[in-house]
Amino acid sequence: EERDRPALIVVDQRMSMFFGTRLNMKSVTAAEAAALAAFRILDQGDRVGGIVFGDNHIAEIRPQRSRRSLDRFLMALADANAMLRADVQRVEPMPLTRVLRAVARIAPRNHLVLVLSDFDVVDDETERLVSGLSRRNDLVVGLVTDPFGDAALPEGLKLVISDGALQAEIDTGDHARRRRLEDMARGRIAGILDWRRRYGVPVLPLSAGEETLPQLRRLMGLGPV
């Protein structure tokens, strides 16, 4: 196994990740998975760094083989996660394209790149950048979801959805609207999962409704703790 390969862990801590219905917020699951992966990478003798981003900030830690670099990454994770609050003022979400361009700059080739996100708002430019990163690096996607988004929406709920600037209330008792929401969520997730076929990118599903460590061990083919 190759040693001292640089690894870059990219962690989404935008407001779209500040959502959870069963166990964790998606932001917490992503942060836990990132921390566990970082420790494992450093223990294997490889360099580790990361990009941690929210809606209006981005922190870059270039890969190094040192505990100090790991500590900087963990601190960036903790700081970004602490900024997520229900009463935070709505801002324009950080575009994934901006983050992926930063990834391409820091990891031009021959890096392990792990991206942990719900991949909210993916467009053609996002996919072009994903394709380019996958050709020059070992790109792995951790698709973070919540069980609420994986199942049929219950009737009789009034949901407030937002794109970061505008808000709208949706009544799930409206069958047509509920079906459109379900189709949109499933279509977005299916599109990300299809990156394996289109770009050869491994897509690892991570649920905020389960403990993070057992999921990672299962995805890596390891037994229970």
Can you describe what each PLM-predicted range is?
Residues 1-32, 39-225:
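Exposed, interaction-prone extracellular/peripheral surfaces
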